[in-house]
Structure formats: C-alpha cells, structure tokens
C-alpha cells in the first residue's frame, strides 16, 4: 500500500524510462493542460543509503541519506532533460505545481515543477511550485523514488445534471464550471423540504453530476503502465478515458484504481477523463452522504514490473520493548510480455529516520499477467519504539523491486510496531497493558464542508476529540478517507473500521442504499484487488469486492484495531450467520492480525447473544444493551466485548471500568451531523435529538462533552464565561498562517460578546463576513441544525457563534471582517504562504 501522504507528492524517477517526467508531467498534468511550461531536468535519484556510516549518493537538491548496513547504494542514472509542457487543449487555468516535500528520513524533497504561463485558449497564469522543505514527521518517507505519483485534484470541469455524450473525448465542455476536487456538490444546496433525500439525507439535493479533466502525458512515460486512482466517489460512479469505459463502482466509500495504459495517448495529444456519479435513486442513506468526487485523485505511472495495488502487508507478530519482528508480504505483477527474474529489497526506517539493515526476499520469476508473485521477508528490530496512544511512533518500509540489478519500482509503507490482543479475561491489551476504549462514533461529514473535508479540518476535528479525552473513533457506518487513518496513526487514536450500514435488507424505505448492490455479481474489472478465490466461489459479489478493498487498503495502519462488518444489520439470523461467517473468514485471510466485530442492535430476541453470531465474531459488539453484552462475553467460551454504540448515560462507563473483558464503549455521537433529522422541517440534522454529539458540527463542546471529559480523566477545559447584552463581534482565527494548498483551511470564529468580552450565548444575530487579500470564504456555519445555506457570507449566530471557513488563493495577507447590525465589528488576519500542507504528528492543535 502506498501512503496517502506519498500520493500527494510529485515524484520522479532516476531511471532512464521516466527521465525528465517530472518536468513535463507536472507541467502538463498538474497544470490541467491549461499552460505552456518549461520542463525541469530529470536527474537521477540518489542511491539508497545502505552502508553503516556511509550514505547513498546525493540526489538533486537532496541531502546525503543516513547509512544503514550493507553496501553503499549506487547513484541513480541521470535522466534526460524534460521537454516543455504542452499548450492546454481546452484553455482551463494552469494551476500551481505542487511543492516538493522532503523525505523525513533525511532526503530533501524535489522542487515543485513549473506551472504553465498561459493556456492556449485563455487559461490563466500558473505558478511555479516551491522547493520542498522539511518533512512532516520523522520516520515517514514522503516520496517514492522510482514510481511516479501525481496529485490529480486540480483542473477539473463540472456539470450538475446529466449530459449525453459527456463520456466522449470530443464533447464540448467549455461552459462547464472549473474546480478542484475533493468536491461535494450536494452540500452546496439548496435545502429543500421536498428533497428526495428526505430528512435522513438532510434535505439536500441528489442526482447526477459529471466531471471531466483534460491532460497530456509525456512521451517519456510511454513505456509505463498508467493508472488513475480515486479515494472515493459518491456514488455509483462510471469512469471513462477518451471515450472508453473503465469501470463502475456503486459503493461511494471505497477507493479504486483503473489501468488506463491501453487507452491513453502520449506526447502532445489531449486525453480526457470523464466521471459520472449518480445518486439519483433516493432515499439512499439514513444520514448525509454527499455527492461527487469528494476525495483525492491520483495518477500513477509505474514500470511494467511493479508492486500490485495495495499488495504490501506489514505486520508485527512479535513486538515487545526488547525486540520485534516485522513480517512483510508483497505481490509483484508483470505487465510486460516476457517473464522477469525479480528480487525484492526491504529497508525499514525507524521514527527518527535511521535506516536499518536491508533485507532481501529470494529472487523469483514473475510471469506476465495479473496473478502476480508473492514475496515475503522478515525484518528484526532491536529495542523498537512501540506505537501507543501516548507515543504514536511511526516506522516506514521502503520496498524496492529490482530487475537485472536495476530498481524498477518502489513502494513506501508507513507502519507501527505494537502488540494488540482481545480476550475474554483482560479485554483489550495494547503492548501488554489493558486499555479501555474511550470512544465516539462519528460520520465523515464536517460542518459546511460536507464530505469533501480538507486534511487540516480532519486534523482539527481529531484534536478537538482528544481534548475531550477521546482515544478511539468508530467510523460510522463506512470506511473514511485515507488521510483520516494517516492522522489517527500520527495522533495516537484507535479506530474501529466499519464496513457497511446495510447488507441485503434496506433500512426504512431507502431503496437506493447499498442493499441494492450488496449481493450482485461484480464485473471482471472493479478497480480493486481480486477477491481471494477461497472466498469468491465463481464471480465475486460487490460486498466481497468492497471488503477486500477496505481491508487491503487499511491493514497497515497501527491505529486500526478491529473491523466491524456492519451496523444494526436487518438480515434475519439464518441469512446473517452464513454471510457473517464468510465476512470474518475474508477479513482473517487478508489480515490475520486483526479481530472482527459487528455493531448489533437488540440481538437478544433472535438467539445471537449465546448462539451463532457470538461464536462467529472475534469480539462481541453491542449497541444500547449492556445486559446482552455482559451475557454474551461471559458465556463459554468467554470473549471480549465492546459497547459499539451507547447514549450519553455516564453509568455505562462504571460498568466498562468494572468489567475486565469489556474493552470500552463508543458514544453516539462524537459530533452533531447532517441528516437523520429527528424532527420536522426545517431541522436538517441530529442536533435536536436527545442523542446529540459531544460537540456541535463546528467543534463547540456541548454540555455532555464536558461531562465525559471529566469522566475520562482528560485535563479540564472551562466553558467560556457568558454575558447578557451583545455589544461587539470578536473575530479570531484558529491558525494565524495558511498555506496555498486546498488541504489547508482556517476557521475564522465570530463570537458575539458583551463589552467585557463575555460570550452572549442567547444571540442569534446574522453575522456578515467579508474578505480581502488572497483568500476565499468556502463556507459559513454556526453549528445550528436549521436549514440555512452553507454558502455565501452571512450566517445566523448559534449560541452566540458563527464561523467563516477560509482558504488561501495565493501568498499574502488575508483580512476577514465580520459585522452585525448594532454591534461593533471585528477583524482577523491570516498570513498565507506558498507550500504544501503536511499532516501533523503527535499532539496536534
């Protein structure tokens, strides 16, 4: 698996067959083909440092790598000069080349490539990317050295509605809206009492949306295999390249990758990728699901012999403070026409970036075809720095694939060294110590952003939970974006990774939910790794394909402690038992290291508590029924249990603490959310429900949040002092600096206060925001659950608070002002600079 932090970086190869690709590829592809840019010289990458005290040969702009043991790595071969970027075929704006980011193990990042200067039919000026600086976290290399991975988020065109012929390359799209992804078009509204999504979907729109992107591929890449990878498209997506259909993916919560090699053109020819997303069959969800290409997109160019999709698995079968064994399996495929003798090398780097001795898997012949060949090796680690909640130490594995002595592909896999067990005596133990899950269950949308959540916003949300004492998240009721798990790894948060909200039976009248696809046969090309033959008897189903996808993608994250096969599944016990048996077997085959549970609702009526379901599951999971849970875990053979969903009643926590086998609980919910509106219009979210979040949608703690903060032993925070007479608008930014990267965002908070600065929580006055400088207001919110647009620059205060969410459009000073009738206005400034956002490590504010 390739870490999502790597996928955000522009990388180039030191090998001849991709020489110069960074200059042309980034200029042509990153600029969205709206520009003509000068290609950078493609120099050889530095050799891998593998000698004690002697680093690898220094690559361009890079520092000498730290030495491990073995022989000094050779210098990468010099590449040829990259040719100039070609003119844009559609005249869309050229965008900035992404900044290079340093390898945190000690190698400086590549320079961002030059953006274009002008599109051939009117594209605006692009900006040169900045030089990479320090890495974002020790021990996590930020860039592949051979495989080319290009961020593909910019330069898209969007049309809301159906568009006949939009799958064809020659389709006229010049009037379409230009934007970048991630993009959630549903959150843009409007709210509508008669929306087909109903109150369960937050009364927001659904339907069909089309995305198109024009790009060119340099001739230097014509010997590679070219893939397009989506982290998530909501929903029922169809992807086309130059008019050829690549595949369909119904489930909007999973990533997928298509091979475009046979259908792309190299050189100056225009390529067009088209994506149709369709959630028009409604209702389709019990909660807000969003719409569109709402997660990141990446374009990958790899040698014909390369590591297969998400094929690297890292586990730690032994892990103590004295020593650990890192066990690695990876699958190499051969897209060529002749068998190749392949060797695989693994280099582990510790959290400080120091490389350990390299380990080699025995050479094997890899035949052409998709089946691939499995390589395994073990890496011994003395005195490892264990991954734990308070010390989230991250190691990394660099896997090099070599043919005839030359490295043709590589893969960087972050991982943590830890031991984790669940049993009926001690519950959950992490590194030999009993740990209780102080958990919350949440949905993936955040405030005015919907489901297209910038990485900074996820970082902010997880930091807010940590302040309340939370140490675990249940991803309700679907897998989250890759960067969410990256942050959980870095911040020491445990994750219960949930698959589905439904199986074969719809919930309520939600005719468009996943039950419509669950048991259907998946096509031969799904965009995911093949389902193991032992599980898929004949054609694989969509549920088998999606679980394979999720587990293979997520299994290397130390934060992921367990999988949940579903939430409150309505299938009858006979159907459910057979399916559950297959699901657990599939999870164990793909990831033997992790346990499997399910969030069961009222299971006592059908015999599950002491019957088949309890026996099949590794860990008993129960929603809202403590007695059933206690019965299930105490019935022989005993097993661990977890309260997968509970309300805010604090009495349950004393039961958790007094029951060793009970691993912990997850409160519903961690934060208010859109959809599942319990009351009538115009309430559009959960906030009026007695089971509201520990915080509102914008992160303001609700009263119960402070209660659980104290119960969980977190340092106390005090609610703001309150006043009675509104006098002024006080404006504050959660961060004084902002990067020109759409993964970064600043929350500008407007507080209605009295003359002494005390918050007037009774105020619901409209707040008007204005902005000057290189910034834009991407949304407004207050935490209110009433139907009120998230777009524009006006928001009614809720509990005396309103927010403007701001992103930078260029470097410089951004000034935001807020005004309200009869009150003194406020001003806040944010300094924006060019750069690439990097995920935090450890305690993040």
Region locations from a protein language model:
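The feature marks long extracellular or luminal low-complexity segments
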Residues: 46, 53-57, 295, 374, ...
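Beta-strand-rich binding/interaction modules
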Residues: 241, 323-365, 373-375, 748-749, ...
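Active-site mouth of glycoside hydrolases
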Residues: 250-262, 266, 283, 382, ...
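Accessory beta-strand-rich segments of carbohydrate-active enzymes
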Residues: 162, 201, 206-310, 335, ...
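Extended carbohydrate-recognition surfaces in non-catalytic/accessory domains of CAZymes
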Residues: 137-229, 285-293, 716
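Substrate-binding clefts and catalytic carboxylate motifs of secreted carbohydrate-active enzymes
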Residues: 148-166, 180-181, 186-187, 282-283, ...
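Ser/Thr-rich, Pro/Gly/Ala-heavy low-complexity intrinsically disordered linkers and tails
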Residues: 3-6, 17, 29-139
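Short glycine/proline/serine/threonine-rich loop/turn segments at secondary-structure transition edges
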Residues: 221-224, 264-270, 339, 381-396, ...
């Amino acid at each position: 698996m390739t870490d999502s932090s790597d996928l955000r970086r522009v990388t180039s190869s030191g090998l001849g067959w991709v020489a110069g690709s960074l200059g042309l590829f980034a200029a042509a592809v990153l600029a969205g083909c709206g520009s003509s840019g000068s290609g950078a010289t493609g120099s050889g990458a530095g050799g891998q440092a593998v000698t004690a005290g002697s680093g690898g040969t220094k690559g361009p702009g890079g520092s000498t790598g730290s030495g491990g043991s073995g022989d000094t790595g050779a210098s990468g071969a010099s590449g040829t000069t990259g040719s100039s970027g070609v003119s844009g075929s559609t005249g869309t704006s050229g965008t900035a080349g992404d900044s290079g980011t340093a390898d945190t193990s000690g190698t400086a990042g590549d320079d961002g490539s030059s953006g274009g200067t002008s599109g051939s039919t009117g594209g605006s000026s692009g900006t040169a990317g900045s030089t990479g600086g320090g890495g974002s976290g020790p021990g996590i290399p930020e860039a592949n050295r051979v495989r080319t991975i290009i961020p593909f988020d910019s330069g898209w065109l969007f049309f809301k509605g159906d568009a006949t012929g939009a799958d064809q390359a020659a389709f006229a799209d010049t009037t379409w809206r230009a934007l970048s992804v991630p993009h959630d078009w549903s959150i843009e509204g409007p709210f509508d009492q008669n929306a087909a999504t109903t109150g369960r979907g937050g009364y927001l729109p659904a339907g069909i949306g089309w995305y198109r992107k024009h790009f060119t591929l340099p001739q230097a890449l014509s010997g590679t295999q070219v893939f397009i990878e989506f982290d998530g498209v909501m929903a029922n997506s169809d992807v086309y390249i130059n008019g050829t259909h690549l595949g369909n993916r119904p489930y909007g919560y999973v990533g997928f990758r298509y091979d475009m090699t046979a259908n792309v053109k190299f050189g100056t020819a225009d390529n067009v990728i088209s994506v149709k997303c369709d959630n028009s069959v409604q209702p389709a969800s019990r909660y807000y699901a969003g719409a569109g290409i709402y997660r990141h997109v990446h374009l990958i160019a790899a040698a014909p012999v390369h590591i297969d999709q998400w094929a690297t698995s890292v586990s730690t079968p032994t892990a103590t403070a004295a020593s650990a064994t890192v066990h690695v399996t990876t699958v190499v495929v051969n897209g060529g026409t002749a068998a190749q003798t392949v060797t695989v090398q693994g280099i582990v780097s510790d959290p400080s970036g120091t490389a350990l001795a390299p380990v080699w898997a025995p050479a094997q012949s890899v035949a052409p075809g998709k089946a691939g060949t499995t390589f395994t090796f073990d890496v011994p680690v003395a005195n490892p720095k264990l991954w734990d909640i308070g010390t989230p130490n991250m190691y990394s594995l660099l896997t090099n694939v070599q043919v005839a002595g030359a490295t043709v592909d590589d893969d960087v896999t972050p991982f943590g060294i830890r031991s984790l067990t669940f049993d009926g005596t001690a519950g959950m133990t992490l590194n030999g110590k009993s740990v209780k899950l102080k958990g919350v269950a949440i949905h993936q949308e955040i405030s005015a952003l919907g489901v297209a959540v910038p990485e900074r916003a996820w970082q902010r949300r997880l930091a807010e939970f940590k302040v309340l004492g939370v140490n675990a998240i249940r991803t309700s009721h679907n897998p989250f974006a890759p960067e969410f798990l990256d942050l959980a790894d870095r911040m020491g948060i445990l994750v219960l990774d949930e698959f589905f909200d439904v199986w074969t039976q719809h919930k309520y009248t939600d005719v468009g939910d996943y039950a419509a696809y669950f048991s259907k046969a998946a096509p031969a090309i799904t965009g995911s790794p093949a389902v193991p033959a032992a599980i898929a008897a004949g054609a694989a189903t969509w549920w088998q394909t999606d679980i394979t996808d999720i587990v293979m993608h997520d299994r290397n994250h130390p934060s992921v402690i367990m999988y949940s096969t579903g939430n409150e599944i309505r299938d009858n016990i006979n159907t459910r038992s057979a399916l559950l048996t297959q699901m657990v077997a599939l999870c164990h085959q793909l990831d033997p290291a992790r346990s499997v549970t399910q969030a069961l609702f009222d299971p006592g009526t059908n015999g599950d508590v002491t019957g088949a379901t309890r026996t099949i599951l590794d860990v008993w999971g129960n929603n809202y029924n403590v007695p059933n849970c206690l019965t299930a875990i105490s019935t022989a053979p005993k097993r661990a249990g977890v309260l997968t969903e509970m309300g805010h009643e604090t009495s349950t926590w004393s039961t958790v603490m007094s029951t060793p086998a009970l691993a912990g609980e997850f409160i519903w919910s961690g934060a208010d959310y859109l959809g599942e509106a319990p009351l009538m219009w115009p309430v559009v979210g959960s906030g009026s429900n007695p089971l509201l979040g520990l915080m509102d949608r914008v992160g303001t703690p609700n009263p119960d949040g402070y209660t659980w903060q104290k119960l969980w032993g977190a340092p106390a925070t005090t609610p703001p002092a309150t006043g009675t007479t509104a006098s002024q608008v006080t404006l504050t930014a959660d961060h004084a600096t902002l990067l020109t990267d759409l993964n970064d965002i600043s929350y500008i908070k407007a507080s209605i206060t009295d003359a002494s600065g005390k918050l007037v929580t009774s105020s619901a006055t409209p707040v008007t925001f204005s902005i000057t400088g290189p910034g834009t207001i991407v949304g407004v919110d207050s935490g209110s659950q009433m139907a009120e647009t998230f777009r524009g620059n006006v928001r009614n205060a809720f509990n005396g608070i309103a927010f403007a969410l701001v992103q930078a459009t260029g470097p410089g000073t951004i000034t935001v002002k807020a005004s309200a009738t009869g009150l003194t206005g406020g001003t806040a400034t944010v300094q924006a600079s060019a750069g690439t956002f990097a995920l935090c490590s450890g305690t993040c504010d």
